[in-house]
């Protein structure tokens, strides 16, 4: 292999290797990893974390009676940034019927409040220090969202996020109301 080809191959690998860690493949139907798919039909794992910026600790039980989206995300994840305005729009479209909790898996909470401000969302963001909540849910990539029905049962899992996924989420929410 020539030196030029070797460098080109190394650059290609360096650029493409991180992609599965942030983005995944949702494809409209909500692809899910094997570990996460075990959650479908089971009660959403409970947790109790304080929102970044203050307030009382929250978790799935805090939103009983509402359709809940538990979204695992990170500040370094570009598809996460795209998904947040969609979640905010869904909250506004279904007032009082839907809730969203963003669970950050970042190593430190430093950029979470800034991320929330930049994306313009008003739903609570919590920091999963030590990633114990992520360990219970087992998200396969960032972002991964778990759609939980009004009884607290995980009904759907979405890995990754692409423009256009809002329609699938809206349809799922309507079916659970």
Regions found by a protein language model. Name each.
Residues 1-50, 156, 167-177:
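N-terminal targeting signals for export/organelle localization
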Residues 38-41, 46-68:
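A short beta-strand-turn-helix
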Residues 64-66, 96, 121-122, 139:
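Active-site acidic short loop of glycosyltransferases
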Residues 66-68, 72-76, 141:
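Short pre-active-site segment immediately N-terminal to redox-active cysteine/selenocysteine motifs
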Residues 69-71, 102, 146-147:
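Hydrophobic beta-strand core positions in alpha/beta domains
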Residues 81-119, 129-136:
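Structural microenvironment flanking redox-active thiols in thiol-disulfide oxidoreductases
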Residues 114-122, 128-175:
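Thiol/disulfide oxidoreductase modules built on the thioredoxin-like
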């Amino acid at each position: 292999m020539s030196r030029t080809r070797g460098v080109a191959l190394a650059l290609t690998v360096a650029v493409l290797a991180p992609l599965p860690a942030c983005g995944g493949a949702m494809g409209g139907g909500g692809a899910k990893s094997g570990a996460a798919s075990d959650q479908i039909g089971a009660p959403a794992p409970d947790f109790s974390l304080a929102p970044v910026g203050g307030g009382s600790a929250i978790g799935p039980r805090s939103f009983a009676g509402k359709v809940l989206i538990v979204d695992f995300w990170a500040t370094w994840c570009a598809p996460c940034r795209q998904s947040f305005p969609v979640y905010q729009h869904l909250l506004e479209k279904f007032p009082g019927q839907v809730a969203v909790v963003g669970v950050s898996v970042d190593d430190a909470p430093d950029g979470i409040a800034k991320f929330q401000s930049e994306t313009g969302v008003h739903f609570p963001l919590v920091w999963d220090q030590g990633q114990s909540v992520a360990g219970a849910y087992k998200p396969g990539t960032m972002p991964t969202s778990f759609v939980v029905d009004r009884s607290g049962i995980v009904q759907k899992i979405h890995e990754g996020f692409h423009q256009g996924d809002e329609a699938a989420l809206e349809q799922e929410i309507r079916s659970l109301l």
